[in-house]
């Protein structure tokens, strides 16, 4: 499932027209409705180059980004270095990931879940999400 190998280096340019700020505002509204407020911990599954992860961090959340594409995480790390933010990125597959600690919420946007095409794989994702969320935690995906 390494769909973005090589493409990572032009991904942000290609996705330049995407209203990430609006998406993040929408996510923050939904998270707050569920009691997940800034200062809480979020995991971003399929974080790619880290754009949404960085926006959530700027909104006050403590973030960890997970992606299975090394090139995408390389770009995310470069952007992180430039921004001075403190975000943990982890090279893992969303079908089989472990977090170092439970989080209050997980998000997966920009069609990341569309790459999960079998019933077994979607079950694996949801099992990992359940294991990684604190009791009462929230999972928002598109």
Q: Which functions belong to the PLM regions below?
A:
Residues 1-46:
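Conserved class I S-adenosyl-L-methionine
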Residues 51-96:
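Class I SAM-dependent methyltransferase SAM/SAH-binding core
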